[in-house]
């Protein structure tokens, strides 16, 4: 029975996370880019002005809302995860350095997709009976499309509830325990025999922390993420930039390999990665599933923002993809390629390849800092996905289930820390990909609304400046 379920899941998983999904996500990104006249490029300086230029202004959010900065930090908390460390390494190992180039291309289109998702989420959001803003794909499907499309909203929410326990929680907890166990073992603090006890303690501590944060509602979630996300991002960026600076003489060669490898991977990898398509597939998929543009999840957090301007919040979506993929994923790639660590092309690789890039430059002592970075990335992801799950289950059953859900979600951290539930997490990953289907249909059908909102936003700004 389990073998049959696993076989079915593998077929669906390969389809959802394979070429068809990439074609759909890239296709919708292209449609949105053309319809907005490549707004993500034309208005990029404006996007940075209304995001970076305003994010450190002290502002109190209204009751039941987050500040725009807290909203983007919560979205980044869920988006910037261990995939930024392990996923990029895997893309390079299988697709060669050229995969990085295609990752950039997917991010360029993903900026417009994420912009559209966030804009629609804020425009079509509602207030629940607790006075909180709620929004996301299920709400812009319900409030933006005709009634015969509403089943897609319930489908998205159901997929989301299933996904959060695996992709958003247990797999991230497993990453935390692995990182801590590895660091403690390397320093001789624990033996492998005592790891199970340590993991149980880690799981309990994480469960308590999660309960304290999530049960405090969106106010507390926003207060935590606005402090944690800038710290962890800056911490990782400084570590990675150090590697790049110390290997600055390799940077021109690395960028040459990235561009050449995008179109002729065999010339860069010694013939091991011979397929142009494989390089493109790995780069595009890493970009898409790192920044989550097309999945619609990030828009759930942005819908909580205390703002009256959907388009202005939409530019935080562009900023989010830029930070996640163009900055953090690119720095991870440069750490691996500039440090010249041995790469076995054609074979799967993960976080260990990225960590090797750090240790080759700094020495073994840095493994403790990379463990801290991985723990921060994973923990922030759990927090962000906790909010997503709460909003999805609330859409299905109402606000009365929020606190029970948050409590159960927190307890799952103990399960993730102590048990190996590989098949269950693989199924959750499949449902994560399935979330993209109803979202992409909705964003495509509502692309005209996005164009209209953008035009109205800039017409209003022009009149205000006149």
Task: Tell what function each PLM region has.
Residues 1-82, 92-99, 110, 245, ...:
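N-terminal alpha-helical transmembrane segments of multi-pass membrane transport
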Residues 4-5, 35-40, 83-88, 166-176, ...:
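Transmembrane helix-loop junctions in multi-pass membrane proteins
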Residues 24-31, 35-48, 156, 173-180, ...:
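Membrane-interface loop-to-helix entry segments
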Residues 31-33, 106-131, 138, 142-174, ...:
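Helix-loop-helix module between adjacent transmembrane segments
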Residues 38-66, 90-100, 104, 112-147, ...:
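Flexible loop linkers connecting adjacent transmembrane helices
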Residues 59-94, 120-144, 155-161, 273-322:
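Alpha-helical membrane segments and immediately flanking helix-loop junctions
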Residues 115-127, 241-257, 265-271, 304-307, ...:
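Extracellular/periplasmic helix-exit of transmembrane alpha-helices
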Residues 216, 223-226, 231-298, 303, ...:
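Membrane-embedded translocation segments of transport machinery
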């Amino acid at each position: 029975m389990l073998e049959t379920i696993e076989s079915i899941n593998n077929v669906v998983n390969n389809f959802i996370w394979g070429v068809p999904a990439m074609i759909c996500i890239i296709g919708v990104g292209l449609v949105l880019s053309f319809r907005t006249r490549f707004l993500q490029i034309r208005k990029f300086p404006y996007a940075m002005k209304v995001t970076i230029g305003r994010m450190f202004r002290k502002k109190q959010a209204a009751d039941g809302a987050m500040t725009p900065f807290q909203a983007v930090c919560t979205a980044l908390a869920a988006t910037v995860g261990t995939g930024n460390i392990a996923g990029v390494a895997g893309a390079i190992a299988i697709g060669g350095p050229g995969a990085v180039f295609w990752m950039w291309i997917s991010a360029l289109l993903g900026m417009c997709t994420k912009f559209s998702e966030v804009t629609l989420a804020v425009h079509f959001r509602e207030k629940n009976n607790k006075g909180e803003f709620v929004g996301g794909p299920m709400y812009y499907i319900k409030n933006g499309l005709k009634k015969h499309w509403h089943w897609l909203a319930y489908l998205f929410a159901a997929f989301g509830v299933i996904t959060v326990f695996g992709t958003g929680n247990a797999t991230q907890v497993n990453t935390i325990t692995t990182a801590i166990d590895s660091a403690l073992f390397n320093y001789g603090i624990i033996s492998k025999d005592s790891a199970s006890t340590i993991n149980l303690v880690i799981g309990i501590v994480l469960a308590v922390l999660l309960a304290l944060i999530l049960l405090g509602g969106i106010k507390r979630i926003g207060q935590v993420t606005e402090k944690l996300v800038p710290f962890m991002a800056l911490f990782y960026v400084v570590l990675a930039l150090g590697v790049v600076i110390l290997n600055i003489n390799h940077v021109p060669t690395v960028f040459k390999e990235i561009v050449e490898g995008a179109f002729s991977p065999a010339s860069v990898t010694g013939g091991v990665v011979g397929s142009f398509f494989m390089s493109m597939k790995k780069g595009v998929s890493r970009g898409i599933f790192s920044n989550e543009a097309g999945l619609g999840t990030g828009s759930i957090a942005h819908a909580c923002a205390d703002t009256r301007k959907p388009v202005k919040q939409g530019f935080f979506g562009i900023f989010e993809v830029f930070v996640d993929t163009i900055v953090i994923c690119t720095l991870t790639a440069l750490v691996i390629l500039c440090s010249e660590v041995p790469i076995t092309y054609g074979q799967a690789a993960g976080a260990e390849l990225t960590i090797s890039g750090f240790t080759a430059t700094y020495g073994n002592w840095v493994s403790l800092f990379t463990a801290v970075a991985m723990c921060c990335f994973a923990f922030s992801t759990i927090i962000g996905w906790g909010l997503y799950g709460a909003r999805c289950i609330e859409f299905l059953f109402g606000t009365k289930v929020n606190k029970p859900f948050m409590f159960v979600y927190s307890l799952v951290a103990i399960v993730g820390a102590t048990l190996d539930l590989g098949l269950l997490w693989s199924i959750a990953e499949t449902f994560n990909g399935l979330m993209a289907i109803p979202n992409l249909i909705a964003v495509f059908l509502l692309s005209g609304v996005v164009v209209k909102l953008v035009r109205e936003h800039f017409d209003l700004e022009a009149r205000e400046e006149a």
